[in-house]
């Protein structure tokens, strides 16, 4: 045994001072002194358990002692009666055996291959023992999980990575995948659980037993992220679910990882063989598969970027020429040719490397250089980790640990060790470049593009350095990284084919580049990722955004400006087609062309296919809404024009819905026979409120009433003859149904018909005569106020003229001023008590004092008060033009009318923009104070003082 170097002899004196009396210096062998000087982990362990050192001296570690691990552990667990005891014994056993392995490794008592075997077998022994103990405990608690035939179902554990390959390093975490064979339920327990519940609960307990730190440490850090769907997927999957996933969604890196997968414990059982046979076709293709080279090149590029980004210098695993590159070289041959060459299907690296050389896939010299380098690097890695039982592959920067490694690796000093290390890593790098290679050097533009690709594909953490996000605040930067990570997790839950992933990987760097250039990057990205989640399984939409950069830019700008638009696009991705043509996107249909465009649009759909007709109506409306909102955001439509467009669109919809309902009713019952001698349908739709007043907003409902002029004795002329007035009732019911039916594209409009005579208690459709009689003899003042903002939005000229005459007659009735003032004011006060002041320290733009409703009540009051003197006041139904009429007819001073108009349009504009932001219609208390004061003054003048 090589004597300790000078720095280590000096350090030994520090060790002596720590040793308790039972471990006096004079009682220790030279071997013990060497190991205790090299490894703080061994030092701490034997100080806590001096008997372990005695055991090491009397029974030194042997190369084949791994064969006894299971028996030794079984004995240690024989008296365990609860989970806490299980956790303690597993931790103590792991530490005791790791001390023995560290002893053998430090003194080079066994080969490096033997060390890897011992480390891997120890992990497997501990995992299997914990699983078997917990399985029995869980069966006692919940019953035994069985399949449909009553056969007990086991939990199978796939050891992945180095654990699966039998090449575990000293301080490694363990990558596991849990599976069970068949669905079924537990039998014999206090209550029945299905197998998924049983194994999920058991899996959670198994992870806790192995992973949870206690005063005795932990057994292994458990990583379950290699399972299907990653962290977002089920903890345990049935064989069928595993097979479905790998057949439909398995990705290149998962295929790469599965090469080393090994079933822990009884690997020759029926279920183990079934699982292996199921996974083999996914891992090893029947044909020679050269696409693997680019996939592995991409993975290596990702690792290289991580090394640069996280500043991982002197990393013997991930650095150029490190352990990972040797693994990549070997697995290239396994994945390309393993399906045709069963001898390449080994999980362990060194036997596979020998096979590669025997098949002349690599030269003997290259294969030998890789073998020697691998053993050198793995010994260095394990020694490095055994100093403190620490998971690291980065060479130390302090003199003590450098001296320790140089001595243990049998070099005179640190420079000699690093010189040999450089030689080995250079050899590895040469073979790697010849076989896999790196992409050619990048231009500055390509480098920037690569950084965006890195941001998307490499799942950066918050502490990563991300130069492309340097311009963002720390909070925004963290939020962007979190959004990307959450989006990737969400993708794992979706069934996305290879083409979809390819398109997404092309799209996302461009999208992130554009979004993250914005100051509001985090907000915009949150809206767009919500949209993308809805379309990732529909490759056509991804391709649209990927192939048309202009469409992507429009999407980003619209989503940034309006969450309402983002929500609409997310709900109805068909609207993405609208982004292709900016000429139509930001240029809404002419106000008088909506009916014609809708008619043309509906010609594509069979007239007798009600479902497609309903869907087409909704799709047309959403596309037009998007255009109006886009123009609104772009500033090309003032508030009055926005409402005009929304109103014309609604009227076109009403026209089409009445047409559909009419065709359906006539097909069923025939036409009312009073129409035989005249044109038209004898039917009208009257719009009230915002529709009647040309003031619709983006989410406004429609206040409608239905009128007809059908005589009492009219009948329909179809085979199924019914009363004419019954026909119009069913027509109105059908119209309501067509508006409110929810399809995949939602409903068309919410319709409120409660403003009809007698409200909800009245008939849904009313004759023109009955309507006139009601308005003259029964209607309340508030119903006459509502009539101010009413107009026919669909109907025969004859019926329209009748309604207009009734409206004019009612509005021009002479009214006693004080009585009217009191009734209007009291109605407003009731509304305010019911709707206003609901939001403390906020101003409700519509309902609170000084808001929109006050202006509407002022105009309605003045029309009802003065129309008998000035009949021209009845001409318009919208507030802005009514205010113009009041000024023109000398009821209101022109200045006051202008002030109220400006306040009204300003407040309406704010409501539109709040709707685009999906925000409620209230603002901070100190907003619009000037407008509100002017409205209050006008209210006081007309409805209080006069």
From Swiss-Prot:
InterPro entries: GlnE, GlnE_rpt_dom, NT_sf, PII_UdlTrfase/GS_AdlTrfase. It catalyses: [glutamine synthetase]-O(4)-(5'-adenylyl)-L-tyrosine + phosphate = [glutamine synthetase]-L-tyrosine + ADP; [glutamine synthetase]-L-tyrosine + ATP = [glutamine synthetase]-O(4)-(5'-adenylyl)-L-tyrosine + diphosphate. Residues 449-946 are annotated as: Adenylyl transferase. GO terms for cellular component: cytosol. It comes from the Bacteria. GO terms for biological process: regulation of glutamine family amino acid metabolic process. SUPFAM superfamilies: Nucleotidyltransferase (SSF81301), Nucleotidyltransferase substrate binding subunit/domain (SSF81593). Its cofactor is Mg(2+). GO terms for molecular function: [glutamate-ammonia-ligase] adenylyltransferase activity; [glutamine synthetase]-adenylyl-L-tyrosine phosphorylase activity; ATP binding; magnesium ion binding. Its EC number is 2.7.7.89, 2.7.7.42. It is an enzyme of class 2 (transferase). Residues 1-440 are annotated as: Adenylyl removase. Keywords: ATP-binding, Magnesium, Multifunctional enzyme, Nucleotide-binding, Nucleotidyltransferase, Transferase. Involved in the regulation of glutamine synthetase GlnA, a key enzyme in the process to assimilate ammonia. When cellular nitrogen levels are high, the C-terminal adenylyl transferase (AT) inactivates GlnA by covalent transfer of an adenylyl group from ATP to specific tyrosine residue of GlnA, thus reducing its activity. Conversely, when nitrogen levels are low, the N-terminal adenylyl removase (AR) activates GlnA by removing the adenylyl group by phosphorolysis, increasing its activity. NCBIfam families: PRK11072.1. This is Bifunctional glutamine synthetase adenylyltransferase/adenylyl-removing enzyme. It comes from Escherichia fergusonii (strain ATCC 35469 / DSM 13698 / CCUG 18766 / IAM 14443 / JCM 21226 / LMG 7866 / NBRC 102419 / NCTC 12128 / CDC 0568-73). The lineage of its organism: Bacteria, Pseudomonadati, Pseudomonadota, Gammaproteobacteria, Enterobacterales. The gene is glnE.
């Amino acid at each position: 045994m090589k004597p300790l170097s000078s720095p280590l002899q000096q350090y030994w004196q520090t060790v002596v001072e720590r040793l308790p009396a039972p471990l006096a210096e004079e009682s220790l062998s030279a071997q013990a002194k060497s190991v205790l000087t090299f490894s703080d982990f061994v030092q701490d362990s034997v100080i806590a358990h001096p008997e372990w050192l005695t055991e090491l001296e009397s029974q030194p570690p042997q190369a084949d002692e791994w064969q006894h691990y299971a028996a030794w552990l079984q004995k240690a667990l024989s008296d365990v009666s609860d989970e806490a005891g299980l956790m303690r014994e597993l931790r103590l056993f792991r530490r005791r055996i790791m001390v023995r392995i560290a002893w053998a490794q430090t003194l080079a008592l066994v080969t490096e291959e033997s060390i890897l075997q011992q480390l891997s077998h120890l992990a497997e022994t501990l995992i299997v023992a914990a699983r078997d103990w917990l399985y029995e405990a869980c069966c006692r608690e919940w019953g035994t999980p069985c399949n449909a035939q009553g056969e007990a179902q086991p939990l199978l554990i796939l050891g992945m990575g180095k654990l699966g390959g039998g090449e575990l390093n000293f301080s490694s975490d363990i990558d596991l995948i849990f599976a069970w064979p068949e669905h079924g339920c537990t039998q014999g327990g206090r209550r029945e659980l299905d197998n998924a519940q049983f194994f999920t609960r058991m899996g959670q307990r198994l992870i806790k037993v192995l992973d949870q730190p206690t005063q005795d440490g932990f057994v292994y850090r458990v990583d379950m992220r290699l399972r299907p769907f990653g962290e977002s997927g089920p903890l345990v999957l049935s064989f069928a679910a595993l097979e479905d996933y790998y057949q439909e969604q398995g990705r290149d890196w998962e295929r790469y990882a599965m090469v080393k997968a090994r079933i822990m414990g009884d690997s020759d059982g029926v279920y183990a063989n079934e699982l292996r046979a199921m996974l083999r076709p996914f891992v090893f293709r029947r044909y020679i598969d050269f696409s693997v080279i680019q996939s592995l090149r991409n993975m290596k590029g990702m690792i290289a970027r991580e090394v640069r980004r996280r500043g991982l210098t002197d990393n013997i695993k991930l650095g150029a020429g490190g352990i990972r590159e040797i693994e990549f070289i070997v697995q290239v041959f396994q994945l390309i040719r393993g399906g045709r060459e069963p001898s390449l299907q080994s999980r362990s690296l060194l036997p596979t490397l020998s096979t590669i050389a025997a098949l002349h896939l690599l030269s003997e010299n290259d294969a030998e250089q890789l073998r020697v380098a691998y053993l050198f690097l793995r010994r260095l890695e394990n020694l490095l980790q055994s100093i403190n039982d620490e998971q690291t592959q980065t060479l130390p920067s302090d003199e003590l640990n450098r001296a320790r490694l140089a001595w243990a690796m049998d070099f005179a000093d640190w420079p000699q060790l690093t010189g040999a290390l450089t030689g080995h890593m250079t050899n590895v790098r040469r073979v790697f470049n010849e076989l896999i290679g790196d992409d050619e050097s990048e231009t500055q533009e390509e480098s920037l593009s690569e950084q965006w690709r890195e941001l998307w594909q490499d799942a950066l953490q918050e502490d990563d350095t991300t130069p492309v996000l340097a311009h963002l605040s720390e909070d925004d930067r963290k939020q962007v990284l979190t959004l990307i990570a959450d989006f990737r997790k969400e993708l794992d839950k979706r069934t996305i084919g290879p083409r979809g992933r390819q398109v997404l990987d092309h799209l996302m760097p461009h999208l992130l580049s554009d979004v993250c250039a914005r100051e509001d990057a985090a907000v915009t990205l949150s809206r767009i990722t919500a949209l993308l989640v809805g379309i990732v399984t529909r490759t056509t939409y991804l391709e649209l955004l990927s192939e048309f950069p202009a469409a992507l830019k429009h999407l980003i700008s619209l989503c940034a400006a309006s969450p309402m638009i983002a929500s609409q696009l997310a709900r109805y991705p068909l609207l993405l087609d609208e982004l292709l043509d900016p000429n139509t996107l930001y240029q809404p249909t002419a106000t008088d062309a909506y009916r014609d465009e809708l008619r043309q649009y509906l010609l594509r759909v069979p007239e007798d296919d009600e479902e497609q007709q309903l869907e087409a109506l909704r799709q047309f409306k959403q596309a037009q809404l998007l255009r109006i909102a886009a123009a609104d955001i772009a500033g090309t439509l003032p508030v009055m024009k926005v409402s005009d467009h929304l109103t014309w669109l609604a009227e076109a919809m009403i026209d089409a819905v009445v047409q559909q309902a009419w065709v359906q009713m006539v097909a069923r019952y025939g036409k009312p026979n009073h129409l035989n001698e005249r044109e038209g349908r004898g039917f009208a739709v009257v719009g009230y409120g915002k529709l009647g007043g040309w003031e619709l907003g983006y989410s406004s409902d429609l206040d409608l009433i239905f009128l007809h002029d059908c005589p009492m004795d009219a009948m329909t002329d179809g085979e199924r003859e019914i009363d004419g007035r019954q026909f119009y009732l069913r027509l109105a019911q059908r119209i309501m149904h067509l508006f409110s039916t929810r399809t995949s594209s939602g409903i068309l409009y919410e319709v409120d018909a409660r403003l009809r005579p007698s409200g909800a208690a009245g008939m849904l459709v009313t004759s023109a005569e009955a309507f006139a009689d009601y308005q003259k003899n029964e209607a309340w003042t508030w119903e006459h106020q509502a009539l101010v903002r009413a107009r026919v939005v669909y109907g025969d000229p004859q019926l329209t003229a009748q309604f207009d005459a009734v409206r004019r007659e009612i509005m021009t009735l002479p009214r006693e001023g004080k009585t009217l003032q009191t009734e209007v004011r009291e109605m407003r006060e009731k509304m305010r008590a019911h709707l206003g002041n609901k939001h403390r320290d906020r101003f409700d733009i519509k309902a609170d004092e000084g808001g929109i409703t006050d202006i509407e009540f002022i105009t309605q009051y003045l029309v009802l008060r003065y129309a008998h003197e000035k009949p021209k006041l009845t001409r318009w139904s919208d507030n802005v033009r009514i205010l113009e009429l009041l000024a023109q007819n000398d009821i209101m001073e022109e200045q006051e009318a202008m002030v109220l108009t400006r306040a009204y349009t300003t407040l309406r504009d704010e409501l539109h923009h709040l709707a685009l932001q999906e925000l409620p219609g209230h603002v901070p208390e100190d907003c619009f104070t000037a407008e509100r004061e002017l409205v209050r003054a006008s209210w006081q003048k007309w409805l209080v003082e006069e």
